[in-house]
C-alpha cells in the first residue's frame, strides 16, 4: 500500500509513503540495532558528537555519524533482508512512476545509505536537505538522488515530518506528513524538511534516514568511499 502526500502550492513534488506489512518484529529489531549503535558511539566514539549532523542541529550522536554505519549491514537479524527488499521494491515503484529514469537502466547501480536517528526529550531535526555537498564539492555527477525516512517507533504522541516548498516565493509553505510506524516515505533529496519535537519526557523517537544514489559508473568507487553504501539490488544478482 502507498500514500501520495500533498501538493506544494500547485506544484506536485512526489513525496510518497509505502507501508511495510506487519512491522512489529522488524521495528523491535531496529530499535535494538539503533540502541546498540548509540551505545557504541556514546561510549567508544564520544568525540564524534562534533561531526557534521547534516544541518539537522540535533543532539543525537547517531545523526552526527550518519555516514559511518549502515543499518542494512545487520543481516544477522533475519528481518533485515526482507526489509531491504521492501525498500528496493518501494524505490522501484517510485522510480518507475515518478521519475524520468528507466528502472532497468539504473537498478544495477543504485546504492543506499541507511542510518538511525534517535531523538530524546525536546529534540527535533531542523530544516535540512539530503543533497550531498560532499559530492558536489568533488564535482561528482549524481544522475539520481532520492532520499527516504522510515518511522520505527513513536514516542507516544503524534509527530510529523514537514516537507517544504522548493519554490522560492513559497519557501515557508509545507506539506505535513504524519509519522506512522512501518511507513517508508520517499522524496527527492533536494526537498527541505524538518520534524516536530519529541515532547515525551521518557520515550525516544526512532527513525531511519536513507539516501539512494545512482553515480556514474566511472565515479562509483570514489563516491562510495565517502560513506557506507550498500548496493540496493545486490541480493538479486
Regions found by a protein language model. Give the residues of each.
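Catalytic core of Fe(II)/2-oxoglutarate
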Residues: 166-237
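Non-heme Fe(II)/2-oxoglutarate
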Residues: 1-102, 124
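Short helix-to-loop capping/linker segments positioned immediately adjacent to catalytic or ligand/cofactor-binding
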Residues: 73, 78, 98-105, 125-127, ...
Amino acid at each position: 500500500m502507498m500514500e501520495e502526500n500533498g501538493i506544494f502550492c500547485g506544484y506536485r513534488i512526489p513525496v510518497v509513503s509505502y507501508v511495510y506489512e506487519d512491522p512489529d518484529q522488524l521495528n523491535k529489531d531496529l530499535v535494538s540495532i539503533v540502541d546498540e549503535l548509540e551505545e557504541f558511539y556514546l561510549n567508544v566514539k564520544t568525540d564524534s558528537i562534533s561531526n557534521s549532523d547534516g544541518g539537522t542541529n540535533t543532539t543525537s550522536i547517531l545523526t552526527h555519524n550518519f555516514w559511518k554505519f549502515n543499518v542494512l549491514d545487520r543481516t544477522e537479524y533475519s528481518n533485515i533482508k526482507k526489509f531491504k527488499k521492501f525498500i528496493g521494491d518501494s524505490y522501484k515503484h517510485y522510480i518507475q512512476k515518478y521519475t524520468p529514469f528507466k528502472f532497468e537502466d539504473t537498478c544495477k547501480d543504485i546504492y543506499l545509505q541507511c542510518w538511525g536517528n534517535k531523538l530524546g526529550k525536546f529534540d527535533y531535526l531542523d530544516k535540512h536537505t539530503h543533497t550531498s555537498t560532499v559530492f558536489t564539492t568533488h564535482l561528482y555527477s549524481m544522475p539520481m538522488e532520492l532520499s527516504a525516512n522510515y518511522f520505527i517507533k513513536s514516542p507516544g504522541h503524534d509527530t510529523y515530518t514537514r516537507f517544504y516548498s522548493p519554490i522560492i516565493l513559497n519557501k515557508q509553505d509545507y506539506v505535513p506528513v504524519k509519522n506512522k510506524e512501518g511507513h517508508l516515505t520517499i522524496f527527492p533529496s533536494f526537498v527541505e524538511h524538518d520534524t516536530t519535537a519529541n515532547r515525551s519526557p521518557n520515550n525516544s523517537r526512532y527513525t531511519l534516514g536513507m539516501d539512494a544514489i545512482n553515480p556514474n559508473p566511472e565515479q562509483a568507487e570514489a563516491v562510495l568511499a565517502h560513506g557506507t553504501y550498500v548496493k540496493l539490488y545486490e541480493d538479486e544478482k
